[in-house]
UniProtKB/Swiss-Prot annotation:
The modification N6-acetyllysine is found at K76, K135, K138, K143, K206, K234, K288, K300, K565, K598, K638. GO terms for biological process: calcium import into the mitochondrion; erythrocyte differentiation; iron-sulfur cluster assembly; negative regulation of erythrocyte differentiation; negative regulation of hematopoietic stem cell differentiation; negative regulation of hemopoiesis; regulation of erythrocyte differentiation. SUPFAM superfamilies: Actin-like ATPase domain, Heat shock protein 70kD (HSP70), peptide-binding domain. It comes from Canis lupus familiaris. This is Stress-70 protein, mitochondrial. The modification Phosphoserine is found at S408. CDD domains: ASKHA_NBD_HSP70_HSPA9 (cd11733). Mitochondrial chaperone that plays a key role in mitochondrial protein import, folding, and assembly. Plays an essential role in the protein quality control system, the correct folding of proteins, the re-folding of misfolded proteins, and the targeting of proteins for subsequent degradation. These processes are achieved through cycles of ATP binding, ATP hydrolysis, and ADP release, mediated by co-chaperones. In mitochondria, it associates with the TIM (translocase of the inner membrane) protein complex to assist in the import and folding of mitochondrial proteins. Residues 63-431 are annotated as: Nucleotide-binding domain (NBD). GO terms for molecular function: ATP binding; ATP hydrolysis activity; ATP-dependent protein folding chaperone; unfolded protein binding. The modification Phosphothreonine is found at T87. Its EC number is 3.6.4.10.
Length: 649
């Protein structure tokens, strides 16, 4: 927690103060810190003493995920089992109960759209009634349902899964990738989240890590991680902007780098703006044009829509390097007149016109971030692009117009975040030194006060009059309900309710003059801790804000068990597959040799071996297949030894 580490931070930042005034600048404000000064601190002095083994850095993305580890002083991005450096954040469940993750899941999405989940990061930590969730329900082929706790979950084959569970399945794939490379178990991880994620979304991401079997040491902001990847080996002091337009979210962060000190000056963004929206906009355009030309409405055909969705994503990517592309989908659907084919040419200019409003939505957050950081575009020495959508030329031009300089391409937009997470893991393990990370909270924190007003704890006076005071008739005591919210709206009801707690034991005569001191801390994961203390009586109560409407401890434990069950099933499947491959190789070699020497082998032995071979091809378990293959191999060796002695020896 920051409160527990301020002394250590002061020592570190004090040393940095000689390097420049802004590296250690804290604005005067309540409790000595302003909203912008709630810091997340990390350096060797703050490294955990208990960390043993490698710490993997994971970018759990909306569209794709990536994992990296530190090798000495350099971060290395790891390839998955399919040989790719990024893994689609897609999870599917087949009709026979098999779970697929990554590219195997994405490949079968056309034939199984209702049970293939993608972009579920947009649902993580969200309530079913959220406007963004209601919008998503209309755009995806799979079912989004209301869970018993009011959260948005997904459904496949009658079973419900939380977005944290789906994220956990992807994290398990990342964990497996790391373990295959390291050669041993990977337990500790740093996971990234969008900078504009609220407390519930951060908690839900940590839940996903726990379900996957990872010990999540830290949750850090994606733009901050990208800045670490960019600036670790840079000696020049400068202010940079990180423009992060990924698959599902948009973040903009302004940072100052001074001799190893990475200070986030401000952050802003939109947690429901990304490549998925670009795909959806193009999909709507294609469906509209197809209906105009053929009279057929594709919106009721999930399989056809999935084909169009994949074609839209492919066309979007191609138009980043080409000025025109063709979209060809034969036999897309059919009506009474026969099959219908989709053939369409799409130019870059047409696509830019379709998504221009989405690109413009990134401008206001950038302007607000510069305003909050108290910098102008002339102060910014470098603009870093992160996220696959920043490959789009129109996005790059918008960034150049906005900041007055061509954006840098010094980092890989798909890998920078995972690299930064691995660097942060190295910091926590004590392997990376001379790095100090100072981050900010993305949204204001406060409480509900009289009239339902949202009172910002970081900018207002620390003494508040609570909205509700309850009296108990039995003993004349009172209890005070305190609601903690997060957001930027003026009324508490319009912001996110993080949690509530009660301060009890306040004498009745003091109610009218009751004033509470409400200090709060934000730990290194951006998770909120609040306490309330009555100035008159000294009564105090504390709360660690848990995900409002999120997963309970029992929920998480059950999901961990389910994840372990899937892991065991995956292990058995891997053993069976290996055994089948081995057996098929032995069968092929044996049959080839027996065919070659059948005239020189006893007929009854040839028939016996053939019968055994055919029978054992149908063995179901890996162990049975292995034993059958071994028996066949031994019998064949004896037979060919006999042949060698008789005809060769």
């Amino acid at each position: 927690m920051i409160s527990a580490s301020r002394a250590a931070a002061a020592r570190l930042v004090g040393a940095a103060a000689s390097r420049g005034p802004t590296a250690a600048r804290h604005k005067d404000g309540w409790n000595g810190l302003s909203h912008e000064a709630f810091r997340i601190v990390s350096r060797r002095d703050y490294a955990s003493e208990a960390i043993k083994g490698a710490v993997v850095g994971i970018d759990l993305g909306t569209t794709n995920s990536c994992v990296a580890v530190m090798e000495g002083k350099q971060a290395k991005v790891l390839e998955n089992a399919e040989g790719a450096r990024t893994t689609p954040s897609v999870v599917a469940f087949t009709s026979d109960g098999e779970r697929l993750v990554g590219m195997p899941a994405k490949r079968q999405a056309v034939t199984n759209p209702n049970n293939t989940f993608y972009a579920t990061k947009r649902l993580i930590g969200r309530r079913y009634d959220d406007p963004e969730v209601q919008k998503d329900i209309k755009n995806v082929p799979f079912k989004i349902v209301r869970a018993s706790n009011g959260d948005a979950w997904v459904e496949a084959h009658g079973k419900l899964y939380s977005p944290s569970q789906i994220g956990a399945f992807v994290l398990m794939k990342m964990k497996e990738t790391a373990e295959n490379y390291l050669g041993h178990t990977a337990k500790n991880a740093v996971i990234t989240v969008p900078a504009y994620f609220n407390d519930s979304q951060r908690q839900a991401t940590k839940d996903a890590g726990q379900i996957s079997g990872l010990n999540v040491l830290r949750v850090i902001n994606e733009p901050t991680a990208a800045a670490l990847a960019y600036g670790l080996d840079k000696s020049e002091d400068k202010i940079i902007a990180v423009y992060d337009l990924g698959g599902g979210t948009f973040d903009i962060s302004i940072l100052e780098i001074q001799k190893g000190v990475f200070e986030v000056k401000s952050t802003n963004g939109d947690t429901f703006l990304g490549g998925e929206d670009f795909d959806q906009a193009l999909l709507r355009h294609i469906v509209k044009e197809f209906k105009r030309e053929t009279g057929v409405d594709l919106t009721k055909d999930n399989m056809a829509l999935q084909r169009v969705r994949e074609a839209a994503e492919k066309a979007k990517c191609e138009l980043s390097s080409s000025v025109q592309t063709d979209i060809n989908l034969p036999y897309l659907t059919m009506d009474a007149s026969g099959p219908k084919h989709l053939n369409m040419k799409l130019t870059r200019a047409q696509f830019e016109g379709i998504v221009t409003d989405l690109i413009r939505r990134t401008i206001a957050p950038c302007q607000k971030a510069m305003q909050d950081a108290e910098v102008s575009k002339s102060d910014i020495g470098e603009v870093i692009l992160v996220g696959g959508m920043t490959r789009m030329p129109k996005v790059q031009q918008t960034v150049q117009d906005l900041f007055g300089r061509a954006p840098s391409k010094a980092v890989n937009p798909d890998e920078a975040v995972a690299i930064g997470a691995a660097i942060q893991g190295g910091v926590l393990a004590g392997d990376v030194t001379d790095v100090l990370l100072l981050d900010v909270t993305p949204l204001s924190l406060g409480i509900e006060t009289l009239g339902g007003v949202f009172t910002n704890l970081s900018t207002e006076t620390p003494l508040f009059q609570p909205r509700k005071v309850f009296s108990t008739a039995a003993d004349g005591q009172t209890q005070v309900e305190i609601k903690v919210c997060q957001g930027e709206r003026e009324m508490a009801g319009d912001n996110k309710l993080l949690g509530q707690f009660t301060l009890i034991g306040i004498p009745q005569p003091l109610v009218e003059s009751l004033r509470l001191k409400l200090p709060f801390d934000i730990d290194a994961n951006g998770i909120v801790h609040v306490s309330a203390k009555d100035k008159g009586t000294g009564r105090e109560q504390q709360i660690v804000i848990q995900s409002s409407g999120g997963l309970s401890k029992d929920d998480i434990e059950n999901m961990v068990k389910n994840a372990e069950k899937y892991a065991e099933e995956d292990r058995r499947k891997k053993v069976t597959t290996f055994s089948v491959n081995m057996a098929e190789g032995i069968i092929h070699d044996t049959e080839t040799k027996m065919e070659e020497f059948k005239d020189q082998l006893p007929a009854e032995e040839v028939n016996f071996q053939n019968e055994g071979t055919l029978a054992r091809k149908d063995s179901e378990t890996g162990e049975n297949i292995r034993q059958a293959a071994s028996s066949l191999q031994q019998a064949s060796l004896k037979l060919f030894e006999w042949h060698t002695k008789r005809y060769v020896g």
